[in-house]
Amino acid sequence: MTYAWLWTLLAFVLTWMVFHLIKMKKAATGDLEAEAEARRDGATDVIIVGAGVAGASLAYALAKDGRRVHVIERDLKEPQRFMGELMQAGGRFMLAQLGLEDCLEDIDAQEAKSLAIYKDGKHATLPFPDDKSFPHEPVGRLLRNGRLVQRLRQKAASLSNVQLEEGTVKSLIEEEGVVKGVTYKNSAGEEITAFAPLTVVCDGCYSNLRRSLVDNTEEVLSYMVGYVTKNSRLEDPHSLHLIFSKPLVCVIYQITSDEVRCVAEVPADSIPSISNGEMSTFLKKSMAPQIPETGNLREIFLKGIEEGLPEIKSTATKSMSSRLCDKRGVIVLGDAFNMRHPIIASGMMVALSDICILRNLLKPLPNLSNTKKVSDLVKSFYIIRKPMSATVNTLASIFSQVLVATTDEAREGMRQGCFNYLARGDFKTRGLMTILGGMNPHPLTLVLHLVAITLTSMGHLLSPFPSPRRFWHSLRILAWALQMLGAHLVDEGFKEMLIPTNAAAYRRNYIATTTV
Ligand SMILES: Cc1cc2nc3c(=O)[nH]c(=O)nc-3n(C[C@H](O)[C@H](O)[C@H](O)COP(=O)(O)OP(=O)(O)OC[C@H]3O[C@@H](n4cnc5c(N)ncnc54)[C@H](O)[C@@H]3O)c2cc1C
């Protein structure tokens, strides 16, 4: 009798445990059944990780071709950041190819018609020229990146075969070397698995997933420090103002009808602290005096600082060459795949160009579960993208190195030579501007321009009277230029593209695959 309560308690605990064991087993079986069901049904054709510019555009393009797309994005709120604020004319063309050009409307974007350059009191404005072979108006757009991203997300989500969900992808699910899907945490904190024959990783410049797929590493080159000056309008709001300041460049541009973005680039190893006010002192004392008084550039630069730097932000500039991922069932795109210095503002354009190519390559395939076929197509994608990616990556890398101010006479000669070349305003400048705007992705033409800039720089250093010292420095310019170019010839697989017949074939192939 005394132990009756103990037996009752034991019986209760045992019943509770058996009940829960049965429940857990049922849930596990149910999960597996649901997964198997999803796989059998082929409920999703493509999973896209990340809905930035690349992920959202790709989702729309693939869904338009009838694919069932599941996009998983970590944060569906409007991104507040200062990258991707100039959509080059070439990027607008790619958006039009994808049926997304209207996403540039109703976001108070500003027309970008020219590049204005400033150095040591001299100034030149270089319009993006009208290239007759380019089927689009040669005008880009200056904008708030977050607004564009939201428009792209809305447009993708408006299609019934796109499921856009907030969630953070934790890992890829792999079976025998083939990626089958992802594990992610949804907004309710539940861990979920999703399966599809193809997963596209578009999780941006801080990508974690990339590391398990490709073995390339990113390099931090410098930092861009930026803030917005509110209630302001530049006297020339349609130019991107690039100041050849020291040690690195400043850039000022209109991003909405009454907001101006001010950016200063700072070396990676000496970035002043934002939190203790060092940064505002640096901007006010070191950078502001170098901003030309032309128009109202300096006034707006200072106004932003004096109004208390509401939201000063810094972003790392990175470079990472593209590497082919040899796993099946997965593709990496956007910044997770390939990055370059943002000095020529072309990352979004390259990502969109990649999407146009990939979409056109995948179009004839009714079933993406043929992973061997998809993997072969990805190999040709990697080659076809070269005219655009190699041209833009090389130009960005060389410009970013040339624009660094140093006390080295040869390097300063090249910096001045670059300014002189751009400021001439002749047919050569126009040619380089069409490359810059993404209207002529032609590596061979770029190499010719780079050779011409080198010769201009050498000529500048030798004039008016060549001396042995000047001659020596001009030879150093040549050596430096060859070294920079040489590195890219190898890295970007440029060599074969420089053979004129190959270059022409590459370009034809590129145009055919980017045009709907
Ligand atoms: C300072 C700076 C200035 C730039 N200026 C320009 C410019 O003017 N013009 C231009 O064309 N390019 C510019 N670029 C480059 C451009 O911003 C990028 O190339 C472009 O934004 C890349 O798009 P993306 O979709 O690959 O990445 P993002 O736009 O970064 O999108 C990645 C998305 O993935 C999501 N995500 C990340 N991890 C996960 C996860 N685990 N699960 C789910 N979602 C995830 C993120 O939330 C994000 O929405 C600039 C770059 C820098 C650094």
Swiss-Prot record:
Expression across tissues: Expressed mainly in seedlings and inflorescences.
GO MF annotations in UniProt: flavin adenine dinucleotide binding; squalene monooxygenase activity
Reactions mediated catalytically: squalene + reduced [NADPH--hemoprotein reductase] + O2 = (S)-2,3-epoxysqualene + oxidized [NADPH--hemoprotein reductase] + H2O + H(+)
Top class in the EC scheme: oxidoreductase
UniProt binding sites for FAD: V53, A54, E73, R74, R81, R153, V169, D335, M348
PANTHER family: SQUALENE EPOXIDASE 4 (PTHR10835:SF20), SQUALENE MONOOXYGENASE (PTHR10835)
Purpose of the protein: Catalyzes the stereospecific oxidation of squalene to (S)-2,3-epoxysqualene, and is considered to be a rate-limiting enzyme in steroid biosynthesis.
Name of the protein this chain belongs to: Squalene epoxidase 4
Organism: Arabidopsis thaliana (Mouse-ear cress)
